[in-house]
């Protein structure tokens, strides 16, 4: 039998039935699921130093285990000395098994390394069932060697779900193990 990530097994065995019971779904296909996780990182100083983009791409690749791509500007912004087509950030989109593996590492090893961590805020939902989480330091991930970090910077992590409402999405992510703060 092929390898399946722990969280994917847990989703199939426990989370689906819990969400069906909570929201009264009649069909398994109605149950919301995690579609993709997008990690993105803006590098504003890359206008003057091109190597910063390479560092950002390299760090996102180490964190996720999948090659990150650099993002480019769509238009000129004179006040930032930015031209159309210049690299300004990095992003990586995780789907399938890599997505579940990353979520497992985020929950079990990265988030507990955050200083004074008491759970994540539930204010990051967008009204359509997606959740945005901001990470202030990339060094919370065990894949990043603190001694080799060029500059401490954060990133945005977006959880895209098939849920129609924020309540469904929050229940899904909480069942998968994301530690939300108690109100």
UniProtKB/Swiss-Prot annotation:
Signal peptide start-end: none
Biological process (GO), any one: translation
Taxonomy, superkingdom: Bacteria
Entry annotated with the keyword Transport: no
Listed GO MF terms: rRNA binding; structural constituent of ribosome; tRNA binding
RNA-binding is among the record's keywords: yes
Swiss-Prot/TrEMBL keywords: Ribonucleoprotein, Ribosomal protein, RNA-binding, rRNA-binding, tRNA-binding
GO cellular component, as recorded: ribonucleoprotein complex; ribosome
Family matches, as InterPro entries: Ribosomal_uL5, Ribosomal_uL5_bac-type, Ribosomal_uL5_C, Ribosomal_uL5_dom_sf, Ribosomal_uL5_N
NCBIfam families assigned: PRK00010.1
Subunit structure, interactors included: Part of the 50S ribosomal subunit; part of the 5S rRNA/L5/L18/L25 subcomplex. Contacts the 5S rRNA and the P site tRNA. Forms a bridge to the 30S subunit in the 70S ribosome.
PANTHER family: 60S RIBOSOMAL PROTEIN L11-RELATED (PTHR11994)
Protein family (similarity comment): Belongs to the universal ribosomal protein uL5 family.
Function: This is one of the proteins that bind and probably mediate the attachment of the 5S RNA into the large ribosomal subunit, where it forms part of the central protuberance. In the 70S ribosome it contacts protein S13 of the 30S subunit (bridge B1b), connecting the 2 subunits; this bridge is implicated in subunit movement. Contacts the P site tRNA; the 5S rRNA and some of its associated proteins might help stabilize positioning of ribosome-bound tRNAs.
Name of the protein described by the UniProt record: Large ribosomal subunit protein uL5
Native source species: Flavobacterium johnsoniae (strain ATCC 17061 / DSM 2064 / JCM 8514 / BCRC 14874 / CCUG 350202 / NBRC 14942 / NCIMB 11054 / UW101) (Cytophaga johnsonae)
Gene that specifies this protein: rplE
């Amino acid at each position: 039998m092929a390898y399946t990530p722990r969280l994917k097994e847990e989703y199939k065995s426990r989370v689906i039935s819990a969400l069906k019971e909570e929201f009264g779904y009649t069909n398994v296909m109605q149950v919301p699921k995690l579609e993709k996780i997008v990690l993105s990182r803006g590098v504003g100083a890359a206008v003057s130093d091109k190597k910063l983009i390479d560092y950002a791409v390299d760090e996102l690749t180490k964190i996720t285990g999948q090659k990150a791509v650099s993002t480019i500007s769509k238009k000129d912004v004179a006040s930032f000395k930015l031209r159309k087509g210049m690299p300004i950030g990095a992003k990586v989109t995780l789907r399938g098994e890599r997505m579940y593996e990353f979520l497992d590492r985020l929950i079990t090893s990265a988030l507990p390394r955050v200083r004074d961590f008491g759970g994540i805020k539930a204010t990051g939902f967008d009204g359509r069932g997606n959740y945005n989480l901001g990470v202030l330091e990339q060094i919370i991930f065990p894949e990043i060697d603190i001694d080799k970090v060029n500059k401490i910077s954060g990133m945005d992590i977006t959880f895209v779900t098939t849920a129609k409402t924020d309540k469904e999405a929050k229940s899904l992510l909480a069942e998968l193990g994301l530690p939300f703060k108690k109100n």
